[in-house]
A protein has these predicted regions:
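PEST-like low-complexity, intrinsically disordered acidic/proline/serine-rich tracts
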Residues: 1-210
Length: 210
C-alpha cells in the first residue's frame, strides 16, 4: 500500500518524509524515544483521530441513532462518534478522538438520509461526501515514530463510497490535518478501504508501541 514504511511498520526516528513539520515539530520528532513510549502507560498516541484512519486496521461503521455514526477500529480498539448537527457541547473535555461534527456534502440531485435535517431513516443516496470536522483533541502522533501533532490540531475528513462494476465497495477517506503549532501547511492523505464480505476477520487489539 501507499506509505508502507509508515503504516505497516514503525519507521526509524527522524523519518518524517512527507509530513510538513516546522522546526519545532522536527525537533520533537528527532527526540522521540521508543523505549520511553514503551515504558509509558499511554500506548495510544498514534491512534488519535488525526492518524487512526491510516492505521492498518479494520473499521466497523454503524448508526447509534439517527444523528450519531460510530466508527470502531480493531487496531487500538478505538471508538469514534460522528455527531450530525450542533456544536461541541460546553465543557467537553479534550480526548484522543476529540469531538467530531458530521454533515452530508450532497452532489446535485442527492438526498440526505440519516443525519439529514428532518429526514431520518436512510443513508445519503445518489452521490456526495460525508464531511467530518474534529476538534477538542489531546496531543499525539501522526505516525508511530513520534511525529507530533498538538492539542491545537483540527481534522477535516471527506468520506466517499464507491462501487465497482464487479460489486466491490470501497470507502475513500481524505484526511486534512491542520496544526498551527507543528505543521507549516495542512497534511493531506487519502486512504482506500475495501468492504469485506463479513466480520469474520474482526479482531480488536489494544494500542501498541512498535
Amino acid at each position: 500500500t501507499e506509505d508502507w514504511r509508515f503504516r505497516m511498520v514503525t519507521a526509524p526516528k527522524g523519518d518524517f518524509a512527507g509530513v510538513p513539520l516546522n522546526a519545532e515539530g522536527r525537533k520533537i520528532a528527532n527526540e522521540w524515544d521508543a523505549a520511553k513510549d514503551q515504558a509509558s502507560s499511554d500506548h495510544c498516541k498514534a491512534y488519535g483521530a488525526p492518524a487512526i484512519m491510516r492505521e492498518p486496521s479494520r473499521f466497523h461503521i454503524t448508526w447509534v441513532d439517527d444523528n450519531t455514526l460510530k466508527i470502531e477500529t480493531d487496531a487500538g480498539n478505538q471508538i469514534r462518534l460522528l455527531h450530525f448537527g450542533g456544536a461541541v457541547p460546553p465543557g467537553t473535555k479534550p480526548s484522543l478522538q476529540g469531538y467530531s461534527i458530521a454533515s452530508w456534502q450532497l452532489a446535485l440531485g442527492g438526498r440526505a438520509g440519516r443525519g439529514g435535517q428532518g429526514q431520518p431513516g436512510g443513508a445519503a443516496q445518489r452521490g456526495g461526501s460525508l464531511k467530518v470536522m474534529t476538534t477538542n483533541l489531546t496531543s499525539g502522533y501522526l505516525r508511530r515514530n513520534g511525529v507530533p501533532y498538538s492539542d491545537k490540531t483540527t481534522v477535516t475528513e471527506y468520506y466517499d463510497l464507491l462501487r465497482e462494476s464487479d460489486g466491490e465497495q470501497w470507502l475513500i477517506v481524505k484526511t486534512i490535518v491542520e496544526d498551527p503549532q507543528y505543521l507549516t501547511e495542512p497534511f493531506i492523505t487519502s486512504t482506500n478501504l475495501k468492504k469485506e464480505a463479513d466480520g469474520s476477520k474482526w479482531k480488536p487489539e489494544p494500542c501498541e508501541v512498535r
